């Protein structure tokens, strides 16, 4: 006789109302494609989209090194499972650019979670050029 498993099934939209209660609109830059140029540098192509979710601060950490001290700002982002977020995507918040470092698949309640780290645009020239283009400061 086949064994019967007692898995519970919950509607994946169960927490959508709760998420919506604490959500705001954010700009997200999604990595469309990656290429390697002749010099061996990775060149990314971004597209600008909107995402709705809840951004929670995880605090600031001081990183000390011989090259100089820096502060790292970390955030967690929660949104509906409908959104597809991947490592490398960047969310804009108060003129800060937060790079997705890790993504957790949505849970049985339909919540998707990812961890973010604030980055400097000087380290992401492709994105910096794209943002200047969107603002009209740079022509293609």
Name what the model sees in each region.
Residues 12-15:
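Intrinsically disordered, non-coiled, low-complexity regulatory regions enriched in serine, threonine
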Residues 2-9, 22-27, 31-140:
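Short, conserved turn/kink motifs that form compact alpha/beta structural patches or helix kinks used as
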